């Protein structure tokens, strides 16, 4: 297992008022993303636990692209990865942002 952490300043607060959401499932080749609205509006944090050791630079690129596209201000993401491909990671992060922007608790 490898633990990775990324912190990014962001342009804007993520939409919505929902406090948390979870998307995905840890299974063969997939990942689970928990997103929580717990940070200041100008910050984003992403913590990753992955079984795929040695892919830190790939994660850095995928996370950097995600933050640039979505500006997820105020959100902390906790990822449990079972070996997902970069496109699946991007999809799950986008789903997490959409989920937390929905109405509800």
Curated annotation (Swiss-Prot):
Signal peptide: none annotated. The modification O-(phosphoribosyl dephospho-coenzyme A)serine is found at residue 28. Pfam families: ACP. It comes from the Bacteria. InterPro entries: Mal_deCO2ase/Cit_lyase_ACP, Malonate_deCO2ase_dsu. Coiled coil: none annotated. Covalently binds the prosthetic group of malonate decarboxylase. Belongs to the MdcC family. Subunit of malonate decarboxylase, it is an acyl carrier protein to which acetyl and malonyl thioester residues are bound via a 2'-(5''-phosphoribosyl)-3'-dephospho-CoA prosthetic group and turn over during the catalytic mechanism. This is Malonate decarboxylase acyl carrier protein. It comes from Bradyrhizobium diazoefficiens (strain JCM 10833 / BCRC 13528 / IAM 13628 / NBRC 14792 / USDA 110). The gene is mdcC.
């Amino acid at each position: 297992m490898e633990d990775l952490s990324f912190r990014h300043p962001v342009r804007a607060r993520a939409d919505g008022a929902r406090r948390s959401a979870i998307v995905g499932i840890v299974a063969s080749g997939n990942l689970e993303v928990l997103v929580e609205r717990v940070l200041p509006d100008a910050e984003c944090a992403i913590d990753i636990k992955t079984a795929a050791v040695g892919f830190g630079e790939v994660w850095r690129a995928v996370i950097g692209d995600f933050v640039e596209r979505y500006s997820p201000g105020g959100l902390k993401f906790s990822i449990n990865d079972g070996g997902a491909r970069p496109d699946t990671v991007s999809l799950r992060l986008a789903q997490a942002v959409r989920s937390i922007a929905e109405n509800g608790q």
